[in-house]
Amino acid sequence: MMIALVAAAALTVEARVSFNDIAPIVWRRCTTCHRPGAIGPFSLATYEDVKRRATQIKIVTARRIMPPWKPEPGKGDFESERRLTDSELEQIQRWIADGAIEGDSKDLPPMPAQPAAEAWQLGTPDLVVRMPEAYTVAAGGTDVFRTFVLPIALPRARFVRALEFRPGTARVVHHANIGVDRTRSSRQLDLKDPEPGYVGGMVPDARYPEGQLLGWTPGQAAHPVPPGTAWRLEPGSDLVVQLHMQPTGKPETLQVSVGFYFTDEAPSRTPLGLRLGSETIDIPPGARDYVVADRYVLPVDADVLAVQPHAHNLARRMEAGATLPDGTTRWLIAIDDWDFRWQDVYRYKSPVALPKGTAIAMRYTYDNSDGNARNPHHPPARVVWGQNTSDEMGDLWIQIVARSAGDAAVLADDIRRKSHADDLAAYVKLLREDPGNPLRHDAVGNLYLEDARYDDAIAEYRASLSLNADSAPTHYNLGFALSMRGRRDEARGAFEQALRLDPEYAQAHNNLGAMLQLAGRAGEALDHFRRAVALRPDNVDAQINLAQLLSAQGRAREALDHFEAALTLRGDSAQALAGIAWIRATVADPSLRNSEQAAELRQRLILYQRRQPYRQSNFL
C-alpha cells in the first residue's frame, strides 16, 4: 500500500520548466525589439542572453511593464497585441523560480527567422524618402523631441497602400509621429533652424492624410491600409516626422527613411480622422483629478478601424467607449497607467460597427501633484495645452469610415465642423493669453479664412504684421483674404510685399499673376505665372493659370503643355480637362486638332461632374 501511494504522488510532480519551454514566448513577445541591431538596449536571442537578465525579466513581466502594452484586456480587441497571456507569464515566472535552467539544447525549437533590424518588412518600396541630413543625438542629457522634414520627390499624384518607417539607429528612437505637409510651412521652420529639423511639434499644416493614423513605435509591424482605403499623396508634399529620441551614453547619429508602397487602385472609401479631446487644457498646480472629456454623436452608420490616444506626462487614466442608441455600451480602449513613453496606434482585429446616433465619448484623468512621479514640474506648476513636452495634451484620434459610400460626405462635413470649432476655441484662448505673439494672430486668421470670415481674418493678419512686418506668409494670407473680399488693389500690394520678402514664393507669384490678369495686365501676369511654375512645377493651380492665359492669347501648343502637366499632377482637374478638350476641338493647327480626344475628355468632364472656377492657391 505504501509503495502504491508513493508512486501515485510521484506522478503528480510537475516537470521543471526549461528554456526550451519559454524560448518561443521570448522570441514571439520580446525579440522584435531585443535582438542585435534592434531598438532594445540588449539582446534576448539566446539562452545566455535571457538567463543574464532573468531577475530583471521576473520583475518587469510581473509588473507588466514588459512587453510594453498599455490597453487593458477585454476593452478592445487589437491587432499585434504584445501583452503576455496569464499562462505565458506564469511559465516565465516558474522558469526563473526553478533556477532558469537551460534544458537539453537539442530539444530547443528553432528561432523563427526574422528580417534584419533595418530590412523592409513589406518588401522593396516603390519610393524611399530620407532625412536630407543625419542628426546626432548627444551622449547624455534629457530626451530629445525634434521634428524633421523629408521632401518627397513625386512627379505625379499616387495612391499609397502602405508606408513603412525605418528609424535608422533604432536604439535611439523611442517613437515617431508622421504627417504630410502640402504647404511647405514645416520646411520653413526647418530652414530657420541651423541644425537638421527643428525644435517643437508638428505644425497644424502637417496632417494625417485622409484619416490615416501614421506613426511608429518599437515592435510595431508595418501594415497595408485596409482594402479600398489607399490615400492620395500629392506631388510637392513633405513628409514631416516628429521624433522622440533617447540618449544612449554615447553620441548616436541617425537618418530616418520611410518607404512608400503605391497602388493604381483608387480608394473606394476614405477613412476620416475624428479627434476627441480638448485644446483648452489648464491644470492648476496640485490638482490630482483634472478631467478632460469629450463626446461625438455619429450622424451616420460607421465603422471604427483604429484609435490613437495621446497625452503627455500628467495623464494617468484614459477611457473611451461608445453608447449605442439602444443604451448598450462598448469599450473602445482603456489605459489605467498612461505612459508618454509608450504610445501606439491600436488597430482593431475587426472594425467596430456603430450605428447612427451612437455617442462616442472619451475621458482622461490628469495628476498635477508631487505624487505623480512623471510630473516634469517640481514643485507642481500650472500646465496648459501645448505642443511642448512640458505642456499637456488630451487627444483621442479615431480612424472611422462611413458604412455607406453615400454617407461619407455627411460624416466628413460633420467631423470637419466639430474639429474646426474645437481648433478655433483653442487658438482664440491662446491668443487672449499671448496677444503679443504674431503666430497666434496668424493661427486664428487662418481659421477665420477657412470659415470664409474674411474681414476677421484680415484684422488678425494686420495685427500679426504690426508685430512682425517681415513675414512673407502673413502678407500672402492677407492678400488672399483681401482678394476674396474683392479688394484687388490691396491684395496685389500684399502679394507684392510677400515677394519682396521672399522672391521665390511660388504661390505669391501665382496669386499676384491672378490679380494682374484681372486688372488687364496680361503681360505681367504671364511673367508671374511662368515664375510660379518654374519654382514649383508641381503647383497645379499655377500650371492651369498659365495654360489658360496662353490659350487666351492663341498660343495653343504651349498652353497644351501646361494643361497636360496639370492633368498629370491632378487627374480629375476639370480646368485641365476642359482646356485640353477646347484646344483639341477648336484649334486651327491640324497637328494639334484631335476631335476624338476632345470628345473623350468631354465625357470625363461629365463623369466627374465638376465645374471648378478660376482658381487661386489656397492660403499658406
Q: Where do the protein language model's features map onto the residues?
A:
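Conserved alpha-helical positions within TPR/SEL1-like repeat arrays
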Residues: 439-450, 473-484, 507-518, 541-551, ...
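Aromatic- and Gly/Pro-enriched helix-to-coil junctions and flexible linker segments
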Residues: 7-155, 236-242, 247-249
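Terminal, low-structured helical/coil segments at or just beyond the last alpha-helical repeat
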Residues: 586-595, 600-620
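His-enriched metal-coordination microenvironments in redox/metal-binding proteins
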Residues: 117-403
